[in-house]
C-alpha cells in the first residue's frame, strides 16, 4: 500500500504478510501476471490457504451485496508495490470466481509502476532502505 489504499474498494485484503517476490532478483522485474511469480507464491502454503479463505468469503458475500442492491462489488488486493502479490492474487481470484459462475473484471492499479527498493521493506531490516536504516539508528 505504498501508493495508498484503494478508495473505491468494498473489500480490501492486505497480502504484505506473504513472501515478497521483489526480493528475488530474477522475479523483481516480473509481475504477478508471470508464471514464475505465481509459481513462487504458490510454493508458500499460506498463499493457497489465504486465497481459499478469501474465495469462500467472496462466494458467500457477493450474492449478499447483490441482494442489498449493489450491482457490483469491488475487491482490492494490496501489497507493498502493487506488482507481484496483489496482481497474482487478483488474477487467481478472478479465475476462481469465474469458475464459480461469477463474471469478474480485473484492473491492476499499480502494475505499470516501476519497482522501487525505497518502498519495499527487505525482510530483516527495520526500514525500507539502507539509507533510511542509517538515519534511524
Identify the role of each PLM range.
Residues 1-75, 98-100, 110-137:
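C-terminal accessory "lid"/substrate-recognition subdomains
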Residues 71-94:
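Catalytic cysteine-centered active loop of the rhodanese-like fold, especially the PTP/DSP P-loop
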Residues 94-104:
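Post-Walker A helix-loop "phosphate-sensing" segment adjacent to the P-loop in P-loop NTPases
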Residues 106-108:
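A structural preference for short, hydrophobic beta-strand core positions in alpha/beta folds
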Amino acid at each position: 500500500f505504498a501508493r495508498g489504499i484503494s478508495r473505491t474498494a468494498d473489500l480490501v485484503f492486505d497480502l504484505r504478510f506473504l513472501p515478497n517476490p521483489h526480493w528475488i532478483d530474477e522475479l523483481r522485474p516480473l509481475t504477478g501476471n508471470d508464471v514464475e511469480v505465481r509459481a513462487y507464491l504458490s510454493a508458500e502454503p499460506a498463499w493457497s490457504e489465504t486465497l481459499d479463505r478469501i474465495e469462500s468469503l467472496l462466494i458467500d458475500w457477493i450474492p449478499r451485496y447483490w441482494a442489498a442492491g449493489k450491482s457490483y462489488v469491488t475487491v482490492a488486493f494490496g501489497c507493498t508495490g502493487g506488482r507481484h502479490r496483489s496482481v497474482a492474487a487478483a488474477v487467481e481470484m478472478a479465475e476462481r470466481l469465474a469458475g464459480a459462475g461469477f463474471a469478474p473484471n480485473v484492473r491492476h492499479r499499480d502494475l505499470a509502476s516501476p519497482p522501487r527498493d525505497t518502498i519495499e521493506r527487505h525482510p530483516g531490516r527495520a526500514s525500507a532502505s539502507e539509507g533510511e536504516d542509517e538515519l534511524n539508528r
